[in-house]
Amino acid sequence: MRVGLQIALTNNIQQEPLGEYLIRVAEQADRAGFATLVVPDHFSLRPESTAFLQRDGHNPTADFFEAWSVLAFIAARTKRIKLSTLVSGITMRYPAVLVKTADTLDALSNGRAYLGVGASPNFGADEHQRMGLPFPSAGERVARLEEVLQMALQLWSGEDKPFEGTYYQLASTIGTPLFVQRPHPPILIAGHGNKMLRLMAKYADAISIGFGRGLDDLRTKLEIVRGHCQALNRPYEQIQKTTLYMAPIAHEGHLDPAALDYIRALAELGIDEVMVRFPADPASFDLLATELIPTVENIPVAGR
C-alpha cells in the first residue's frame, strides 16, 4: 500500500511566503517517500458549503491559489513524487486547455502528472457563480465529463480529425504530444455517484473514492465499479484505487492505532493508496514520514 499527501492551497496559509512554503513541503514530501502529492482545485469556497474546510471567522470565503500553476511550481523542485489535482471539475476550464495543461505538467515533471478530473461537486455552485462560470445540472456535468474524457483520448492519439460532441467541438485534435508517459498521462477520476462509477470503470487509470464515507459504503462503491468493469470486459485490477483519509493520524507524538486499523481495512478492500492531509506541525509530519510510510508500505493490498 502507498501513502499520498494532500496539501492546502487556501488563503489560510500564513506561516511563510507561499513559494517558500510550497518548496519546503514539496521537497520534504519528495524525500520522505510519499507516492503522490495532490492539491485541491477550487477558486473560492464558503466554508459552510462543505465539511472539508475549516471555519475561519476572519474570512467569509476560503480563497484558493490556482492549482495547476502550483503543481508546475512544485514539479520544478521535486524529482520523484507523482503530481495531481484532487480533482479538477470540468466546468472550471475549457476542456481542451485543461488537457494541454496536464500534458505540459507531465513534460515539466518528466512523466509524473495525472489528469485529475471530476464532474464538479454540488457545493461548487456558489464558486462558479462568483467566477462567472456556468454550472449545469449534475446529470449534465457527468455527461460533459464523459465527453471531456473522450476528447482527451482523441487529443492524445494525435489523430487529425474534428471532435464533434454534444457540448464541445474542436476543429482538429492534431497536436504535438508533449507528454512523457505513454500512452498518455494517467486519468484520475474522483466521485461517488453511480454514473461516476461507470465512468471510472470505463476511462480511469486511477480513482479517488470514499471522501470520508464509511467502509461499508466504500465496499459497495468498489463492487459497483467491479461490476461495470465486468460488463465492459475490462480487468478491474487495471485501476488503481485511492481514497482521501480526512482525520488526523498523528496524536500526541504517536500514530493513532484506530487510524492504522482503518488504513489496514482500506487495504483489505483493495485500496492501493491512502491520501493523508499535510499536518500543521513539523513533528506530526516527521511521524508520517518516519513511521506511517514504512508501516503502510508493508500492508498488503487485497487483489494485488
Model-assigned labels for residue ranges:
Residues 1-304:
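Active-site-adjacent structural elements that line small-molecule/cofactor binding pockets in enzymes
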